A protein has these predicted regions:
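Non-catalytic C-terminal accessory region of glycerolipid acyltransferases
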Residues: 10-143
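Membrane-interfacial amphipathic helices and adjacent loop/beta segments
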Residues: 1-10
Length: 143
């Protein structure tokens, strides 16, 4: 089943946990920042520049105690090839070093994405200026 999530609420997290425990996969687009700008992004090096990536997949995997895999699809010689790879069995985010640990996971993902972008640079699509300034959380209007 397809579940589009724009915000992780406790109800959504419980639903995702049930899906994982029943053997289903949860796919998160790792090269996009959150729809609602909540500031949960991490700036890391990507293709020679700094770029913001979401922290959400790693925080969620840490809370749900589930592994992370990556999935890339490249068209090579007229045939689509899927690359499904183990990323981490467990995401550990220690309280004292949480920001550093998140940065390490996000950088590892950016490095892996970069590898596939270098293999097929015209097959990575984004529809906004990817290498912009760091993402700032949305400000709630004051009353």
């Amino acid at each position: 089943s397809l579940l589009q999530v724009t915000e992780i609420s406790p109800a959504v997290a419980i639903s995702l946990d049930h899906k994982i425990k029943s053997g289903e996969f949860v796919f998160i687009v790792g090269d996009r920042i959150p729809v609602r700008n909540n500031g949960r992004t991490q700036e890391v090096s990507f293709l020679g520049e700094n770029a913001s990536f979401s922290q959400g997949p790693y925080i969620l995997a840490s809370l749900l105690k589930c592994p992370i895999y990556t999935l890339f699809c490249l068209k090579e010689s007229g045939t689509y090839h899927l690359y499904f790879e183990h990323f981490s069995e467990k995401i550990h985010l220690p309280r004292k070093d949480r920001e550093h640990a998140l940065r390490e996971y996000v950088q590892r993902f950016a490095d892996r994405l970069q590898k596939y972008c270098m293999m097929a640079p015209l097959q990575w699509f984004n529809f906004y200026f990817f290498w912009s300034t760091p993402v700032e959380p949305e400000q709630k209007p004051s009353s």
